[in-house]
């Protein structure tokens, strides 16, 4: 079993005003086998350097996509990144674009809603697993192993009243579990 080279791509349009993603990323960014990137900070104009991004993917084994779960999806720069970087001939189709075959994909998200809102018949009508299917299928098409996502629920900005909102201490507990997961992860 080998220790993976980890690429953590943080996609948050305003990380300085974040609670959840800020705490999560700060807790793991110093891991020795991890390359940490704040993609919004790197591309404030959204002009993605495709060749650079593809090389980063080639140089790593476990690719982590960390972001808030906006409108049942991701921040716009992550969608742009997927459209540009995971291009035909590089990431797909099988047998032609197979550069990512065997790499692992981990999604790490924060939601504003509580866990029970993400179920059949719940406020959001669908489970997180169902809502993340487009990402899972993207990983599948690219020949990557989809890992069960890490989800931190009920993370709202400070000062929002009337909704369940976990404390920074609770977020830190999730951040510790996230760190332990990355530290102990092996490529199998």
Residues covered by each model-derived region:
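N-terminal beta1-alpha1-beta2 submodule of the flavodoxin-like/Rossmannoid cofactor-binding fold
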Residues: 1-93, 176-188
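Helix-loop-strand module that forms the ligand-binding subsite of alpha/beta enzymes
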Residues: 51-136, 142
């Amino acid at each position: 079993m080998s220790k993976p080279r980890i690429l953590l791509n943080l996609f948050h349009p305003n990380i300085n005003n974040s609670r959840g993603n800020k705490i999560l990323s700060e807790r793991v960014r110093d891991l020795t086998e991890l390359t940490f990137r704040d993609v919004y900070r790197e591309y404030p104009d959204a002009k993605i350097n495709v060749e650079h991004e593809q090389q980063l993917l080639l140089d790593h084994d476990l690719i982590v996509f960390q972001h808030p779960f906006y409108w049942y999806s991701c921040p716009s720069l992550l969608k742009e990144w997927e459209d540009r970087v995971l291009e035909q001939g590089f990431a797909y189709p099988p047998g032609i674009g197979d550069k990512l075959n065997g790499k692992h994909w981990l999604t790490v998200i924060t939601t504003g809603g509580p866990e029970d809102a993400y179920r059949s018949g719940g406020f959001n009508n669908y489970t997180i697993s169902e809502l993340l299917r487009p990402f899972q299928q993207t990983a599948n098409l690219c020949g990557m192993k989809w890992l069960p996502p890490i989800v931190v629920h009920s993370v709202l900005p400070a000062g929002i009243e009337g909704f369940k909102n976990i404390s920074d201490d609770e977020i830190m507990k999730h951040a510790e579990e996230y760190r332990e997961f990355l530290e102990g992860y092996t490529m199998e």
